């Protein structure tokens, strides 16, 4: 059984600069992007997520980007090595802090990636 994709909500475009934590660095010590491009048909939910209680709360994420396999285009292969990659949405730059991969039930086929950004 394939899970449905919320086509009506996937209307956003983000610009992603993938960096690998073990990638080469330029002469100024900055990580060189391994892949860069625009990803269309994503679901973007920009709302601040907190962790903690009362006055001891910290910001965990400023937004959530969901890229669906077979619908979002192009969809790069992402791994935990890509944490810290840069993402641009509506002219603002964000850093990927969490990356989750979800597979179709009963298979190992990719359903979507969820990126939490700050």
From Swiss-Prot:
It comes from the Viruses. InterPro entries: Minor_capsid_put (IPR019612). Pfam families: Minor_capsid_1 (PF10665). Belongs to the Lactobacillus delbrueckii bacteriophages ORF5 protein family. This is Uncharacterized protein ORF5. The lineage of its organism: Viruses, Duplodnaviria, Heunggongvirae, Uroviricota, Caudoviricetes.
């Amino acid at each position: 059984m394939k899970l449905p994709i919320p086509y009506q909500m996937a209307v956003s475009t983000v610009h992603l600069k993938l960096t690998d934590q073990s990638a080469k660095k330029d002469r100024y010590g900055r990580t060189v992007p391994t892949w860069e491009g625009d990803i269309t048909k994503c679901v973007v939910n920009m709302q601040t997520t907190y962790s903690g209680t009362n006055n001891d709360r910290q910001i965990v994420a400023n937004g959530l980007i969901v890229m669906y396999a077979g619908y979002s285009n192009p969809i790069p292969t992402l791994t935990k090595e890509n944490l810290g990659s840069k993402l641009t949405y509506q002219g603002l730059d964000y850093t990927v802090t969490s990356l989750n991969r979800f597979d179709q039930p009963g298979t190992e086929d990719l359903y979507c990636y969820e990126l939490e950004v700050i």
